[in-house]
Amino acid sequence: MDSRELKDRYVNPYTDFGFKKLFGTEMNKDLLISFINSLLSGKEVVKDLTYLNTEHLGTSEADRKAVFDVYCENENGEKILVEMQRGEQQFFKDLSLYYATFPIREQGQKGEWNYRLKAVYVIGILNFTFDEQSNDYYHHEVKLIDTRTKEVFYDKLTFIYLEMPKFNKKEEELNDMFEKWLFVLRNLSRLLERPKALQERVFTKLFEAAEIAKFTKAEYDSYEESLKVYRDWINTIETAKIKSKEEGREEGLKEGEKIGIEKGEKKKAMEMARSLKAKGVAINIIAECSGLSEEEINSL
């Protein structure tokens, strides 16, 4: 019997299963094309995509294996790597750069070769924030630049980061496809029905693909397991944050207590020195008794 206990109507795209269900299958590649084109804002238009192997090995056995969420190339042979960063990672920028080396290195050719490369795009959908300077700046596009002229030095390596927690627009505030896609990614698993603002054909297909009730038993079981892994991961992150805060608070209390004691002792020493000084005791003797410097005693 197919027993289904999940109450959500739509899949959570932050789960491994959910993300690959929506963006990692040939059947739904038009969803990925629409999403990528919304990110590029017309600077380039992707017409078609070919999915590539998401598992990559380094050039030696010592290299770490890299497994991408989605890896594909467009009709021009340009490589596009899409990663869903589900939890905060201290070195996610380093990870992005490391991942970018794989689609670059695999373009190498034996024999005579002029080293001309196809463009590489690394897209990171982040379920955390890394730029605390601005709450409104959530779409980062990073390229290699000349630090003096601020001009783009190399335009065929692009990193796009989306800080999803910063995107808080409501349905009635959505202005374009980019914002609509971010709204879907941010809210899909919480929605009970398709929002009126999302009437484009691509979203019709997305909501049909995302509906949990239409999953086969095998899909449902895979999603349930993926959701458990995601929730365990989130709980681990939250527990670590709480523990860190508690340790910081405890350390702060200890440090505050230490500072308070030191201030109290200093105050007593100054009162004693002031009293001895008033009685005409020599400065060097007061310094020896109180632990204060002669300069401090002279200033009393």
Task: Please state what every model-predicted region is.
Residues M1-L300:
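Elongated, amphipathic alpha-helical interaction scaffolds
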